[in-house]
Amino acid sequence: MSDSKDQIYQDAKGAVGAFEFDERVAHVFTDMINRSVPGYAMMLEMIGVISRRYAQAGAHCYDLGCSLGASTLAIRSNLKHFNESDNKPKVIGVDNSAAMVERCRVNMERMPSVIPTEILCQDILSTPIENASIAVMNFTLQFIPLAQREDLLHRIAVNMKPGGAMVLSEKIEFADTDKQHTLFDLHHDFKRSRGYSDLEIAQKRSALENVLVPETIEAHIERLQRAGFSQAYLWFQCFNFVSFLAIK
């Protein structure tokens, strides 16, 4: 994984363009997400724990929006109990950023495994989902147009084996104004504690405007249930960042 420091928004810009997962972001993404998302390391660790329990022999484990492959590796490294199996699960990472996929493939090669792994450069809205026992979307759905989110989750649920699991991690908003302001401000305090300046925070926020569209916890759980998951739980929250577990 790249450990280059995120300085993309360090200098004042006359006009801040829309955020893109381009070469610049791919180069510093590991630093960016660890300094921007409170609890990120814990989420990755628990994705591994969840994968160990719910991955099924011969089934597919999807990381949809895999970026540099942190979640992909968390899944794969917890499938070692299948190493001697003749019916191993297959791990499939998907991302539509060529810059991310290129680096992700390198990261997979640096940590070889006998678990079959494929990294695809595709739009997850058109990626075939088949024979799934695990599906992870780690801060991905928030970048999908609102009108297309439910169809995507329904397609995942329909093509998931009984007893399979989905992990959905998202930045959220709150209907309660006081809670929204308090946790929003605490998130910015977290970013300052990780070395981001007020200018960097403001410019990144501007870049993400209308690109990252958050929703409430209730909206996410209700959608997961409508999509076809029998159970949907909030299992993690740190300020305005959460993760859900949905069971088929």
From Swiss-Prot:
Family (UniProt): Belongs to the class I-like SAM-binding methyltransferase superfamily. Cx-SAM synthase family.
Record-listed E.C. numbers: 2.1.3.-
GO biological process: tRNA wobble uridine modification
CDD domains linked to this entry: AdoMet_MTases
S-adenosyl-L-methionine recorded as keyword: yes
Keywords: S-adenosyl-L-methionine, Transferase
Complexes and interactors: Homodimer.
InterPro entries: CmoA (IPR005271), Methyltransf_25 (IPR041698), SAM-dependent_MTases_sf (IPR029063)
Keyword S-adenosyl-L-methionine among UniProt keywords: yes
Alphabetical list of HAMAP family matching this protein: Cx_SAM_synthase
GO molecular function: carboxyl- or carbamoyltransferase activity; S-adenosyl-L-methionine binding
Function of the protein: Catalyzes the conversion of S-adenosyl-L-methionine (SAM) to carboxy-S-adenosyl-L-methionine (Cx-SAM).
Binding residues for S-adenosyl-L-methionine: 40, 65-67, 95-96, 123-124, 138, 205
The protein's name: Carboxy-S-adenosyl-L-methionine synthase
SUPFAM superfamilies recorded: S-adenosyl-L-methionine-dependent methyltransferases (SSF53335)
Known catalytic reactions: prephenate + S-adenosyl-L-methionine = carboxy-S-adenosyl-L-methionine + 3-phenylpyruvate + H2O
Signal peptide: none
UniProt gene name: cmoA
